[in-house]
């Protein structure tokens, strides 16, 4: 390198563009992720089918997030299965805030042999802390079996219609729901007391 050459602080992509030009800025990313007024393909289709839901925007990977009420979950889930979302990739739950609502979350994928990037959608069902009940989707996607049981075991969400809803990680006589934010951990628990 010669003394009078300026060293560039930027990096070039394989196309020769500066990395800053090729990569979306944080502000443009935030606009897509946080703008709840933008409806995605799945939300538009559900609206055409007159199925109640609320668009919540997109996650950081561009996956559409929809809120569904517990009483509408079965009809929306069946419609999405018919639309082609044939795989429940993940079902989980979380505690929104101490003393607040719980959420049951469903990550659905549209698997097709001809597609490199399968379409995905995320459903969220918010439930009251006292007596959180939601229909099981086990009858639509069998992969919900152990996942709904884990959500029941850790958060106390009751999945109505699940064929074998019981604790899966904790002993049957465990008191409370360990992953709730207001859960008080016991001082000790002896395993021999569980059997």
From Swiss-Prot:
Catalytic activity line of the entry: a plastoquinone + NADH + (n+1) H(+)(in) = a plastoquinol + NAD(+) + n H(+)(out); a plastoquinone + NADPH + (n+1) H(+)(in) = a plastoquinol + NADP(+) + n H(+)(out)
Keywords for this protein: Chloroplast, Membrane, NAD, NADP, Plastid, Plastoquinone, Quinone, Thylakoid, Translocase, Transport
E.C. designation(s): 7.1.1.-
InterPro entries noted in UniProt: NADH_DH_suC (IPR010218), NADH_quin_OxRdtase_su_C/D-like (IPR037232), NADH_UbQ_OxRdtase_30kDa_su (IPR001268), NADH_UbQ_OxRdtase_CS (IPR020396)
Cell compartment(s), UniProt: Plastid, Chloroplast thylakoid membrane
GO MF annotations in UniProt: NADH dehydrogenase (ubiquinone) activity; quinone binding
Topology within the bilayer: Peripheral membrane protein
GO terms, biological process: photosynthesis, light reaction
Entry-linked PANTHER family: NADH DEHYDROGENASE [UBIQUINONE] IRON-SULFUR PROTEIN 3, MITOCHONDRIAL, NADH DEHYDROGENASE UBIQUINONE IRON-SULFUR PROTEIN 3
Family statement: Belongs to the complex I 30 kDa subunit family.
Protein name per the record: NAD(P)H-quinone oxidoreductase subunit J, chloroplastic
């Amino acid at each position: 390198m010669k003394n009078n050459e300026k060293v560039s602080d930027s990096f070039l992509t394989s196309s020769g563009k500066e990395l800053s030009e090729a990569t979306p800025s944080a502000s443009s990313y935030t606009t897509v992720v946080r703008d709840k007024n933008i409806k995605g393909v799945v939300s538009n289709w559900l609206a055409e089918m007159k199925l109640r839901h609320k668009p919540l925007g997109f996650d950081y990977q561009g996956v559409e997030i929809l809120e569904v009420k517990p009483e509408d979950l079965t009809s929306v889930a069946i419609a999405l299965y018919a639309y082609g979302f044939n795989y429940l990739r993940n079902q989980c739950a979380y505690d929104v805030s101490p003393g607040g609502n719980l959420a049951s979350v469903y990550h659905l994928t549209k698997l097709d042999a001809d597609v490199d990037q399968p379409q995905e959608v995320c459903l969220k069902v918010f439930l009251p802390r006292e007596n959180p009940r939601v229909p099981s989707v086990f009858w639509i996607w069998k992969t919900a079996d152990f996942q709904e049981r884990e959500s029941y075991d850790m958060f106390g969400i009751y999945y109505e219609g699940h064929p074998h809803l019981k604790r899966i990680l904790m002993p049957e006589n465990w008191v409370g729901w360990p992953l709730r934010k207001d859960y008080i951990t016991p001082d000790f628990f002896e395993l021999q007391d569980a059997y």
